[in-house]
Amino acid sequence: MNIVYRFRIYPNKSQKELFARTFGCVRFVYNRMLAEKNEYYEKTGKVLKVTPAKYKAEFPWLKEVDSLALCNAQLHLQTAYKNFFRDSSAGFPKFKSKKNPVRSYTTNCVNGNITLQNGKLKLPKAGWIRIKQHRSIDDRYILKGATVSQEADDKYYVSLLYVAEEPEHEIRSVKTAIGLDFSMRELYVDSHGAHADYPHFFRKSQEKLAREQRRLSHCEKGSSRYMKQKKKIARLHAHIARQRKDYLHKESRKITNFYDLVCIESLNMKEMSQDSRFGTSVHDNGWGMFTDFLSYKLERAGKKLVRIDKWYPSSKICSCCGKLKKELKLEDRIYSCTCGNQMNRDENAAINICREGLRILGVELETERKIS
């Protein structure tokens, strides 16, 4: 099982210069290989096999950076091709732009060339770097690689990839379960009637973002004032992203600690984000990120996440009598049934999602437990 830990790092001036050169070399090798492969295929109809080593004689400055970072550029290009041929919607491999505000490179741990100890991280070519290690790492985990990134706000981070043994936990009897129904307004409503009460970080900052964007539009493109304002906007976006990520981590941890089984709907977030009615809410809520966090946290704890088919009519089924209500509009926020049941539409759906998850798993709920 792969586990990734992300920490902030504080490189000195020379290390920042090395990272900048490495980012540039990785981008250069990736783009060069992509261009040559495309050109060769157009001429011959065959696939060109090329490695970064080919370019070092012609471009000796490539030897100044970590060679494993260049090798990983080749692997990333191969992955991009595989993704495209497996599913064309992934898109054909594209050239990497120098203007991308987020830059990164990946290297591998070989013969102890990457070491983490005493608040410092050792990386190939860069040496020892100060790191903010805010959490401990199990000594049994094996370090396999590191990805160094520079975010749009000019802060540096490292993502350390560890390999751990697969947990041997297996759910034998589910004592606690919960269903979550995606909510545009509150992230989710659960099967006990609790609402996530999502803070909507993006919406709260929209006015400030719009103001900074207007200031940017008044700057001359390419000027120092323009670049300074652009970085200011990037820092604001990065701050919003960190707020969202922190909230979703804490919310998914709370649910994981309380429940053995979590049931959710399989929603196509890409399609929903393109809908004019949902776009901003889907982007702001981060439901896809939230379910990813839930998935790996539950897996590590030996617990279960069940995804219900997106065509399952969770909103239309009465959670009391089981009757299907065919006519139910999106604006109908209260579910009313002829049996007398009247409740919040999302809560009704969450109860049905939980029951369907239990049915799929083939277990019966022994006790109920609510998050306090």
Feature annotation, model-predicted:
Residues M1-S372:
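Nucleic-acid substrate recognition interfaces
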